[in-house]
């Protein structure tokens, strides 16, 4: 069985199509080719917000003004990967931001695979955006001890990966955490820390271990 990859990934977010509610002949887009790229160079884009935009009536047009599926436009212009973030419960509290939960990520993965695109899913371990300035612990876990939080990360990660498997749409890559240079799942997993980063390391290991338990073929 072909090895699948589990690692952190920087996607080259290349805008391949034109987004607008009305097509415009004046909205010219030019993307100059980059010479000497290796054949396995990933050309990807994060499209987590796409279902939300479509639900609000957004339409997408290719460079010739023809209305098309945005994923198809991207593929036509060289995109071969998409990234999908997963928030634990984006409908809780302030939430929103496209409600990019597990269910939407599964649906988008199926849609991408139908077009021959590969998929990376990105666990934020948050109900909202996780980045260097904020790594909010999901509300359901916010009163956890360190041991409880480690267990929650493991169990949640394993369940999501198994859900993708059962849906018949395993992602080609899985990213544990998002923009985690300052840690994740604050305050327990925040960096730098007084414990020598042990709590952060335990949380990371829990996520990685869960993926490999659910899918031993990942490296």
Task: Describe these PLM feature segments.
Residues 73-196, 203-218:
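Substrate-binding cleft and catalytic face of glycoside hydrolase catalytic domains
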């Amino acid at each position: 069985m072909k090895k699948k990859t589990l690692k952190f990934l920087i996607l080259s977010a290349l805008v391949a199509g034109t987004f607008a509610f009305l097509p415009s002949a004046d909205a010219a887009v030019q993307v100059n080719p980059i010479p000497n790229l290796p054949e396995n160079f990933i050309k990807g884009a994060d499209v987590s917000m796409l279902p939300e935009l479509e639900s609000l009536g957004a339409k997408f047009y290719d460079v010739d003004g023809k209305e098309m599926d945005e994923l198809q436009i991207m593929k036509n212009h060289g995109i071969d990967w998409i990234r999908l973030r997963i928030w634990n419960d984006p409908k809780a509290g302030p939430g929103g931001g496209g409600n990019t939960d597990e269910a939407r990520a599964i649906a988008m993965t199926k849609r991408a695979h139908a077009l021959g695109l590969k998929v990376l899913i990105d666990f934020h371990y948050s109900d909202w955006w996780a980045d260097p300035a904020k790594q909010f612990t999901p509300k359901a876990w916010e009163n956890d001890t360190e041991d409880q939080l480690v267990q929650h990360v493991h169990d949640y990660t394993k369940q999501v990966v198994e859900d993708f498997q059962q849906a018949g749409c395993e992602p080609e890559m899985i990213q544990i955490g998002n923009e985690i240079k300052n840690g994740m799942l604050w305050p327990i997993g925040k960096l730098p820390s007084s414990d020598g980063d042990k709590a952060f390391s335990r949380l990371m290991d829990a996520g990685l271990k869960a993926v490999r338990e659910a899918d031993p073929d990942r490296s």
